[in-house]
Amino acid sequence: MKKEMWEIENKYFLNATSQRFAKTIFHYEIFKKIAKIKGDIFELGVFKGNSLMRFVNFNEVLKAKKKFICFDDFGDFSMTGKSKDDKKFILNWRKTTGKGININSLKKKLKKKEIK
């Protein structure tokens, strides 16, 4: 597992754009501002789980002790009753981004971090 983690991390740093780094820094700066404020974190739309896991890690690093409440349908966007433009957007979104994380995979990742 450790070797796999190193390989994944190395691939990320070798291939990530400055936009990806900026997003991580932006999320960190936001989390620092809220770390000491009372309350919990709500993630509305988990998608692939990246920002959720980023915030979970920031929570550990900054010892914020926040609770995370996450919502998602863990499935594809529905095409039922959508306009032509919405359907076009959804199809392009699927093609560009792929599928989101399924709930069982997310639960496994959270369990490794001892999060329910």
Write out the residue ranges for each language-model feature.
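N-terminal pre-P-loop "Q-motif" helix
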Residues: 22-26
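S-adenosylmethionine/decaboxylated-SAM
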Residues: 2-18, 28, 35-116
